[in-house]
């Protein structure tokens, strides 16, 4: 096999050959390495010697813009700062500057509805594990077309199973790092098993989290339970759902909302199981390890919480960061 020796002058023709159907979802990317925004997917690159690439040494957040408003951005930036402190990574910009970069990138993308992925890397500098060989951290912001769960899953529910992949230790569980190998294996496990999601278990048999999802249980007594955050990521969507669920307690649709250990058997016997995530907001799980949950159909609390979340996302101006000047 003869290898092509490619040079800079070849890039224009390579860009035409490069495009694939999925690239249509990549709308814009800001790179602090390039110092600007690109909209051609061929240019959406990260240096191979960036420690985020070869060591997973970076952190990230994913959030969405709905009708020209970024939802709950401050919660994501707060968690980004927590992750940065935990891995001793200096953010190359303050929250206000990061917000301006995100807003500017969305504007250039030309869309009002999108999913944004914000990465902060250790930066380029070499191929060892030594973080000090990187002169400075870098920021990459990718704006993509919005994605969500199929309407069928919202209407009929999803199937989940317990995972065989070891749960993360507490220190790493609450760092949203770019080292997501356990999460990748959990998703592979779900696809291979023919279910939508798998749920991690700790050493004592208590529920953890999905590959990118938090889980909640509505008991037959009307208690909405969530696993403790000690071994799982403090999800922004589930945190918001907890706040909103208090109105259901006041309306006597729920008895209370708690964080506690949840066994598999308790989950099997629950009346509803709920999944929470940035892309789909909330989904009902109607089958767990082959056990039908509750009536086998999405329940009342799912429908009520879904409505509350949708109203919060669309109408809660206190959690909106406007992208366009007219707003």
Place the predicted regions along the sequence by residue:
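Short, acidic/charged, Gly/Pro-enriched secondary-structure junctions
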Residues: 96-127
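Helix-start/capping segments and mature chain N-termini
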Residues: 1-93, 100-104, 126-327
